[in-house]
Amino acid sequence: MKFPNAQATVYNDTVVRQFAIMTVVWGVVGMLVGVIIAAQLAWPELNLGISFLSYGRLRPLHTNAVIFAFGGCGLFATAYYVVQRTCQVRLFSDKLAAFTFWGWQLVILAAALSLPLGYTQGKEYAELEWPIDILITLVWVSFA
């Protein structure tokens, strides 16, 4: 039932759209790296003798890109879309939502640069160095 004087809520779909687009972009990048390392299993010479193109350096990049970049962006997009509509309110702060978007993209970019260069903690699914971990914490706390 609609009330005659009720105003329609205007949602912040900008951040939802940004995260949705980057979900596709990072999904393609992550899957492409996966195809490259799968091909390297059959043809090891595909790394061209370049250390940052080796299987051992690209595999952490692939797993982190698919889990954190693709999965994380999809999670943020879904959460920002669903919460606004189920609660029927706009996001608390557009600037905070923008920070989560740009902060998360910075996390992904830092991971994409550091992992092939070999800067890791050497722990499966927790390879990222501590400065990136701090940025991840800041983004997730601001999201909460």
PLM features per residue range, with description:
Residues 6-10, 53, 122:
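A generic structural signal for ordered alpha-helices
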Residues 2, 9-10, 59, 91:
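Intrinsic disorder/low-complexity signature
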Residues 123-129:
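Membrane-helix interface and helix-disruption motif detector
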Residues 1-5, 141-144:
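Juxtamembrane interface elements at the cytosolic ends of transmembrane helices
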Residues 17-119, 130-144:
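Hydrophobic cores of alpha-helical transmembrane segments in multi-pass integral membrane proteins
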Residues 4-18:
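Cytosolic juxtamembrane amphipathic/interface segments immediately preceding
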